[in-house]
Regions:
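Active-site glycine-rich loops that stabilize anionic/oxyanionic intermediates
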Residues: 19, 27-30, 90
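Serine-hydrolase catalytic-loop signature spanning alpha/beta hydrolases and amidase-signature enzymes
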Residues: 27-37, 48
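Active-site loop/oxyanion-hole signature of alpha/beta-hydrolase fold enzymes
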Residues: 8-14, 37-40, 49-91
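Alpha/beta-hydrolase active-site loop signature
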Residues: 29, 53-57, 117
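Conserved alpha/beta-hydrolase catalytic His-Asp/Glu region
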Residues: 130-160
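Flexible "cap/lid" loop of the alpha/beta hydrolase fold
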Residues: 94-102, 106-138
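Structural signature of beta-strand start/N-cap positions in the alpha/beta core
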Residues: 21, 47, 82-85, 106-109
């Protein structure tokens, strides 16, 4: 499915449905399309908000969990979101944990899927290689139990 990507206050995001807010945070090699099933199912009863995390746009020396939590805090403030159900996948789950610890008054529920955790202090041994289609392709395929799920279309979306 294709959803309108909105832009405001320097943030790019999807905002679908009405009701209580489900804020979804994608993973390191995630793409917005990873949330298609969630959006189509839950947007009937909830407002689904998905910011595009600036994982590859950030300066590698400044990029990290703290910066991504700060980005999320800025996004939540700019959109005036509160009483959130925060759902994070993979790296998005790690960001969600740290965000919740810093801002517990804003969180109604926390949902983690395949999350990295509190006892990890970074994004692995090295920062992802920018501009390497082969590297991104390998990492996206590695994300799934069945690597065939990592279609060229999905890899292209993550690479962009």
């Amino acid at each position: 499915m294709s959803y309108l990507i909105k832009e405001s206050d320097g943030y790019r995001y999807i905002d679908e449905g009405q009701g209580d807010v489900l804020l979804l945070l994608h993973g390191l090699f995630g793409a917005l399309s990873n949330w298609d099933g969630v959006i189509s199912h839950f947007s009937k009863n909830y407002r689904i908000v998905i910011p595009m995390l600036p994982i590859y746009e950030m300066n590698p020396r400044e990029a990290g969990l703290e910066a991504l939590v700060a980005f999320t805090e800025g996004f939540v403030a700019s959109q005036k979101l509160n009483d959130l159900t925060l759902i994070g996948n993979s790296l998005g789950g790690h960001i969600a944990i740290l965000y919740t610890l810093k801002n517990p008054e804003q969180i109604k529920r926390l949902v983690l899927t395949g999350s990295s955790g509190l006892f990890e202090n970074g994004m692995g041994g090295s920062y992802p290689k920018r501009g390497s289609y082969e590297y991104i392709s390998e990492r996206v395929a590695y994300t799934f139990y069945d690597p065939k799920v990592a279609t060229k279309e999905l890899i292209d979306e993550v690479f962009e």
